[in-house]
């Protein structure tokens, strides 16, 4: 493998054996591609905004004299960039401008004569834009739109599995689900009649729909039944014989023909009998007259002479009727062929219960069911039925729905109209009847072929269309009003409904979620999440077990491990690593093609439905060098089952062992040794890890760390290769390689880094460069590390030296004992940034004012504020300190004489304002790192706001001029090269000032052209700089667009440094979580023979019952990795020659049986080897991919190489006594995470505080400053102990005895420790509730 200069800094040793056929795809593509489809212009008009416009336009007036046509649209440039939007609290969006054409036709002239055409561009609101990382900035906060897994449109056949009716009879149903429009359900009832429901309303006999489609009874019977024809010849009854229909029946008479008896009366008719009848070509047999009684006629029979109806279609024949028919000359009688086995009489029975007999009565019946209580008219009934399923405005199956519909009915073509046809409805009924007759299977709703993904783009398009439809109604009205000659398109369109619909979706839809930004992994996982909840999806309460369960089709599409615990389990899932959606929105996963038993590198993506037709081998099947399967029998999956197949039956093979799991689960090493429940917790808890002060790469990883860190967008990644020309904490400049430059550009890339900003979860986002001056970089190299990344690898926690042993009960029940060294070295110190805002409003009594002049506040409290009343940057503040001084006007009250006097002496200001300053919340302390002041347009800016503005302008100017200098330098170096190659002497050139270079002329025409081109560029560059500076200046100095009634907003940012402490929650990656019970002095910790103490002591009893053995293997492998690092460290300290170092590192990389990774250190220079060794000092990072990891033997070999005992256990000594523990202890390195459940955020105590209004009991919870509930069971405990006085105190003065508690307070102040309990308020509430029921209850005074 070829490594770039940056990648050579630290190479992770990979234990993976299976070759990597397919690289991990870009992990955010599901979001970015979907949104791209939404906003990019689609000439076909199938997706996105274009599709929405085409579906609504052209809009015609009611008279048809004019119409508004859609031409095209364009998205403008956003006003602010992403960072500015976040600071200002606005939405990152672009204006949508649509070109519309108003066409007016001549009234008197023949149709289609155009009188006037006007075209105009109309503003249609703002469309939020997606950032490069797949998020949206809505009102200043980053949000993610989660993809939804919903039932695909189409037709589904299902059954109630015998649960509806008490007899346990299975009732089948069919449901046609459109993309938008009414649902159509067909269902059987226990009596086997077929019914229909529209939109889950009252059920009607199914034939009503057919009658409404203008079918007569005869035609209905004709559609669903085969005929049995009887003929009357010579007073004998003959039946046309189709032998196959007799199979399985019992003969009720002798079946004979031509004097030969084929079946005797009372015998069963078998296949042999049928073969004989077919062989002798018997077409008719004679039947006794009684045989026809009870048969059902298939059409109307009329007496030709009188025109009288003898018997109507679907009537049962009797012998009398037969005689009448014979008399009136009908010698041929057609009846319906039915039997109890596979030709049930369901439709015939349904026609009998159908109260309607013609189209009109059917339409009226449907109208009554849809609009109960409204008087039906013929027109209303017809238009309602037309609009239900046959109008393109109201009903759309969509391309997906039509494809699924046609596939389900086994039709050949998969495209068609979006509305239903007569044939569609009849085919669905036919298939449902076939299923009831035992032919065909019902569908599995949980199959991923029947559920599809709706991503951002599609949901945004739907919302946009909703807005457009609202506009359409208004436009129709306007078009019909007249005086069109003066109107322009923009007078027709009101953009409000559109922007309201879009805003509502992005701001408050259930699937638009506040982004989980704890760390890079939680960001990526959130964007790859798939939810079955949300509009048009399931609800938690109604979702049963089946929907939540893992389905065989999840394989490689949805992760079986990562899902929340709790009420949402199984409803919210995560996309697997390699999964993607196809054009229809179904999930598909890649497989390697197998041709004639040889596995090729050809990759095919298969959806769940396609996969069902193939035999697919597992990724861990053994192959030889040519790609043949080694074993004769290979474990494969086929049709959702796993079994053995011979190798020539295999069609496909998995691409990777980690294809089954999601990104989160693929980061757990030795996942294959963990129980699924714990793996689930491990995958979920990695998302809660707080980024530590110094990120530390995991010693034992899975090889996915780099992909996650790069794709999450928290790191700065090189867009093009080049050399590092300049680097400091906030900017990296790359001089681009010649071959990657665009013609005529300066060839400089500038990367501005994010410094100390706040994330959604109040953690700190900060980027630090990890390249040095002069280093070569290639495209895709990581230039700067973000939060939780280390040299471009995800680093959520720290490598800790752990020992598995009990220690004085401090690790009882998953508690964790931590060494003081961890605190001293700041291993788990995290920085949290809080934003506190102070809003100054315009009130009825006058404006609120931000000032340092606050009534009744001492000098000390104002010491940290400047003269504008805003805290200084760098001030250290604690709970209760004033950050921003603010006073609010107070209502005039009746003044006492004393106050009047004070007023008279000291003037007005004395008492008409109250202090409403922004203070630091209780329990929070930190350092002020930034202050932002936003002032409404037209409000005078205070001194502090002007200072901040001045500073921002200076900074912007400095940044831009530095950028300009860098770009100029790049440009002039190219100009110099052209001049020198054109014959100008270098020395003379360097003496000339640079501005004069461009005035020189060259004889060589081509060089002169190049020079002129560069000169043009130079002018453009300066012009661009001026434009940028002006835009920046305008943005900084202009007033802010604040909410109505708001004059000023001051935002203060506090940085809080949190060390690890008892009560914080920690976890490993295997679901092994615990709470810190004690921080132990280093000298008391167990230590080994070299005197190295352990950092963390874990309880060994946490392993066996939880079955997450992965943590033990990780510990051993971590020990080996550290051992190798220690040896390299020793060699570096002894300054051994590079050759020895190179040889040892090479041995470490080569270790392991047939691993895929080949690191060849002979291609590294000595400097590169030394730098690699420097980065391996703290341990050699190791990758052990999921399901393809290091084997036990390989771990032992690695331990041996590091001169460590192969058992992984060492002798430890007690730190307090120095005595040896009685048996060796497992010690190693485990990657531990500090989770975002910190004791500082949770600890809370109350003395007195707020009370509930009704019950007068203290509130609960930290947010309300509430108390701890003394509940039912606690009361029982006190009762059981007979602690009567304590109990009385708990139920009265400490809770809701209002008078008692105020008296108690007074008593304590007076030093009199007595209580006088009275009546608890909640008892009064009970009395009131009983009285409200009309029962008078009174308490007697004794």
Swiss-Prot record:
Keyword Ribosomal protein: no
Record-annotated membrane-spanning stretches: none
One Gene Ontology biological process: DNA-templated transcription
GO CC term, one of those recorded: DNA-directed RNA polymerase complex
Single annotated GO MF: DNA-directed RNA polymerase activity
Recorded catalytic activity of this chain's protein: RNA(n) + a ribonucleoside 5'-triphosphate = RNA(n+1) + diphosphate
Keywords, alphabetical: DNA-directed RNA polymerase, Nucleotidyltransferase, Transcription, Transferase
Annotated Pfam families: RNA_pol_Rpb2_1, RNA_pol_Rpb2_2, RNA_pol_Rpb2_3, RNA_pol_Rpb2_45, RNA_pol_Rpb2_6, RNA_pol_Rpb2_7
Enzyme Commission code: 2.7.7.6
Entry keyword Transcription: yes
Quaternary assembly: The RNAP catalytic core consists of 2 alpha, 1 beta, 1 beta' and 1 omega subunit. When a sigma factor is associated with the core the holoenzyme is formed, which can initiate transcription.
Family: Belongs to the RNA polymerase beta chain family.
Functional note: DNA-dependent RNA polymerase catalyzes the transcription of DNA into RNA using the four ribonucleoside triphosphates as substrates.
Alphabetized HAMAP family for the sequence: RNApol_bact_RpoB
Protein known as: DNA-directed RNA polymerase subunit beta
